[in-house]
Amino acid sequence: DGRAICLQAIAFIEQQRGRCMTNEKYGRERTLCFLPLNHIFGLMTNMIPTALEGNPQVYLHDRAPETILKTCRICKVELIMAVPLLINGLSSALQKKVSKLSAPKRRAFRALQNTSIAIQTAWPEGGMWIAKHVLFKSVNAQLFGPTLRQIALGGANAPQEHLRNIAALGYCVSFGYGMTETAVTAYDGAVDMKARLSGCSGKLLP
């Protein structure tokens, strides 16, 4: 049943994090319903277990880039499950804007990126907060906003260059793998920088 499926999924994630799950979590984690629900990825993530856990879902008026970003900011979205095209496009647009800056500003931006990656490598959770709320506060105010905790991707790989650009902003990007016949079969929810930049799909679900 739906409750059992939810508990199995949560238990696997907690096992990966090295924690012991002692009770069920009925959260208020706002999830962006980005994926079509008639697709196996959307069905098995936005419907099962997200909806069955009681988490509120945010629906898009359309899938224009600005609509996605504005919706996330206004509705304070915390979790996005999508395909790599989302962050690839965002990273490319960011790089294009940076390339138009003056040379000193470009160097300053790159220095902030390197600083952010270094802090997150040493202190993943705290580093993400610092990157999101301090180093790139003004940038994130124009993107997903400060509330977004995780972007879970599936369906394809993403270039490391794009993963690094998004990670530097303080957003945690993770990957999973699945097929139409089996739904989600693997997931990597690690927050350390090495795992986030590897693009690894993680361990097989039990």
How would you label these PLM feature ranges?
Residues D1, N46-M47, D62, L163-I166:
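Composition- and surface-driven signal marking solvent-exposed, interaction-prone regions
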Residues G2, R28, M179:
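ATP/adenylate-binding site constellation spanning eukaryotic-like Ser/Thr protein kinases
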Residues G2-R3, L35:
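Structural detector for helix-capping/boundary residues
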Residues R3, L85, A156-N157:
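Alpha-helix/helix-capping structural signal
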Residues A4-I5, I87, G178, A195:
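Tryptophan-centric aromatic hotspots in well-structured domains and transmembrane helices
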Residues C6-R30, L37-H133, K137-S138:
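Conserved AMP-binding/adenylation subdomain of ANL enzymes
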Residues R30-L35, Q150-L153:
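Extended hydrophobic secondary-structure segments that form protein cores and membrane-embedded regions
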Residues V58-Y59, P124-G127, A141, P146-G154, ...:
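Conserved ATP-binding loop and adjacent catalytic segment of the adenylate-forming AMP-binding
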